């Protein structure tokens, strides 16, 4: 007699919870519609009306005179450094700065410059140490620029308070040095501080903001600057291969990222806090003082090994310098953080 096959419940595929970065966000339906309907022209000729609107909007929101839409945050930062530095000059930056850790030698290649790092607990440099790091001797690389990063990625997504920024800006003014802000996640800082992005951008010569992280656009950053620097920045963008022709299809998403994206960041921050507290309850080494925006770092015994095991249970994260980084973002559901904690706990129990 033929055996009947027992009923088998069809298992749903495991949902992947992607905590590697807020760059993994996908454009919303509204963004896709705006992109499809965007009015375009040739942006290399400054004839794309949607790009022009994005640049003007970013400048208005940040309180600077002019903006330049570029493909990436690295390009935005590097154009700023090219604007400010002469070859052989030095940038003073906080330890762990993105321009030092994650922009692979671009400063040396493009500007012929070097970086001097100063101590920056929680991403906040001591203005006295910044002042002491300024070089004027012919025996040393002369200082050409001071740079800050807000929020500070490597410090844990920490926020540089307004008064700390003002103190370093004062050092720059007294030394007649320009000052650049890497504000890739500046809107996260503004939400965390209950401030405006314009207030945090005030006093900087140039500011870089990223549209494709927590704000949710698929591509792009904007470099904000005085009008007097805009033509030279435009030339540098062309030199670096950043002219994108009918870029209005991308700028349309960027406009929505700027107008709608900041409203969702507080939720990202709350998810990160919930995640961090849950990890601490699991006995993991989490410095809760650093969990100020949408990032959580912790230091396990084997970061790379743990990241690989978590990937097997559908939790994606990055191992960076012996630490695990988890980043919350708009594409996560309300159930994803509790579920991620359950999966992390199951992996820890097995090891």
Which residue stretches match the model-derived regions?
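N-terminal amphipathic/basic-hydrophobic helices that include classical n-h-c signal peptides
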Residues: 1-13
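Conserved PLP-enzyme active-site core in the AAT-like
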Residues: 11-300, 304-313, 317-332, 340-350
